[in-house]
Amino acid sequence: MTTEKINLLDFDRKGLRTFFAEELGEKAFRAEQVMKWIYHFGCDDFDQMNNINKQLREKLKAKCEIRAPYVSEAQHSADGTIKWAMRVGDQDVETVYIPEDDRATLCVSSQVGCALECKFCSTAQQGFNRNLRVSEIIGQVWRAAREIGLEKETGRRPITNVVMMGMGEPLLNMKNLIPALEIMLDDLGFGLSKRRVTVSTSGVVSGLEQMIGQIDVALAISLHAPNDKLRSEIMPINDRWNIEAFLEVVRRYIASSNANRGKVTVEYVLLDHVNDGTEHAHELAELLKGTPCKINLIPFNPYPGSPYKKPSNSRIDRFQKTLMQYEHTVTIRKTRGDDIDAACGQLVGDVIDRTKRTKAKQFDGQAIPVKTL
């Protein structure tokens, strides 16, 4: 019988130190040496770790592995965006690299599929299968960094920012999300600034409550409607946690956070003649008066079978100008990678849907009926 090896990508620094001490009988600094090899040098071969003694290397080879998701398919957009299908077990999630003049952002998935059933999102139409492990979340960053490193001659910019805006709802996977974020921020990990790591949530109030005082990163909230009636129609999660409850915990999080500089990013997808009217803009502006924020408008990115359309440029422009009358900071997200279905709301992966085979899903020990999400 073969014993499954321990994947070291599943540990943040604290967990790795504990594992080395309790399971390997090694001093903590050895764990930190190995962690530096993994993340600073992209190393997954213990034999290449030349400042680690041979006895420990042999012990690591016998008991451990460094295994990130692998790229099963890569698609390149005309604008430089790359979408990778990352293989996790017997399924794929999608990870997107978005280069810009002054940064390169990696959009990372947190779940295989999504259970939230937002009506305008392609991922939601795939159903939900499972949460990703720490190694499968941070492994997307590790693999992407290696892929970009292999293309140095192309002049591709190294990853400077990570956004948890891929497939899934990050705050329904807190057990694995928090250690992955810790590795992104850790100097022995990817060493990213907390202002360059963003978690986006559709309104999981219980998860955001847990984040207060536990992890400090930039926050983006998927609001997408100015009132509960409309939001519940397009985002069923609103029936569980309404806008008032959502914004209340958002205000508390940003008050406790240095990463957000006192403001949260409010994401608002514009759906033609659904939530993009002038009356919606006025209502949204009034709603957000008590919440320090910047508003990011996202023109809808179509996908096959969707009942929604992207608004005309004139409607988008009018919506933005109406919000700006209230002295809100308002930007319009530039669509990137839509020619390879890598834009916001278009990620689908390869998901074996399990939501239709069970009445409830278990998220971090809490049973949440799918129909009430």
From Swiss-Prot:
Q: Matching InterPro entries, A to Z?
A: Aldolase_TIM, Methyltransferase_A, RlmN_N, RNA_MTrfase_RlmN, rRNA_lsu_MTrfase_RlmN/Cfr, rSAM
- Location of the Radical SAM core domain: 100-339
Molecular function (GO) terms for this protein are: 4 iron, 4 sulfur cluster binding; metal ion binding; rRNA (adenine(2503)-C2-)-methyltransferase activity; rRNA binding; tRNA (adenine(37)-C2)-methyltransferase activity; tRNA binding
Where is the major localization of this protein? cytoplasm
Q: Which residues constitute the signal peptide according to the record?
A: none
The active site of this protein is located at 94 (proton acceptor), 344 (s-methylcysteine intermediate)
Write the Enzyme Commission number(s) for this entry.
2.1.1.192
User: Cofactor: bound how, per the entry note?
Assistant: Binds 1 [4Fe-4S] cluster. The cluster is coordinated with 3 cysteines and an exchangeable S-adenosyl-L-methionine.
Name a Pfam family for this protein: Radical_SAM
Q: Which domain of life is it from?
A: Bacteria
| Biological processes annotated in GO | rRNA base methylation; tRNA methylation
Q: Which GO terms describe its cellular component?
A: cytoplasm
What are the protein's UniProt keywords? 4Fe-4S, Cytoplasm, Disulfide bond, Iron, Iron-sulfur, Metal-binding, Methyltransferase, rRNA processing, S-adenosyl-L-methionine, Transferase, tRNA processing
Where located? Cytoplasm
Which reaction is catalysed here?
Answer: adenosine(2503) in 23S rRNA + 2 reduced [2Fe-2S]-[ferredoxin] + 2 S-adenosyl-L-methionine = 2-methyladenosine(2503) in 23S rRNA + 5'-deoxyadenosine + L-methionine + 2 oxidized [2Fe-2S]-[ferredoxin] + S-adenosyl-L-homocysteine; adenosine(37) in tRNA + 2 reduced [2Fe-2S]-[ferredoxin] + 2 S-adenosyl-L-methionine = 2-methyladenosine(37) in tRNA + 5'-deoxyadenosine + L-methionine + 2 oxidized [2Fe-2S]-[ferredoxin] + S-adenosyl-L-homocysteine
Q: Which residues bind S-adenosyl-L-methionine?
A: 168-169, 200, 222-224, 301
Which family would the database say this protein is a member of? Belongs to the radical SAM superfamily. RlmN family.
Q: What does this protein do?
A: Specifically methylates position 2 of adenine 2503 in 23S rRNA and position 2 of adenine 37 in tRNAs. m2A2503 modification seems to play a crucial role in the proofreading step occurring at the peptidyl transferase center and thus would serve to optimize ribosomal fidelity.
**PANTHER family registered for this protein in UniProt:** 23S RRNA METHYLTRANSFERASE, RADICAL SAM CORE DOMAIN-CONTAINING PROTEIN
Extra remark beyond the main annotation: Reaction proceeds by a ping-pong mechanism involving intermediate methylation of a conserved cysteine residue.
Name the chain's protein.
Dual-specificity RNA methyltransferase RlmN
Q: Which organism is it from?
A: Vibrio cholerae serotype O1 (strain ATCC 39315 / El Tor Inaba N16961)
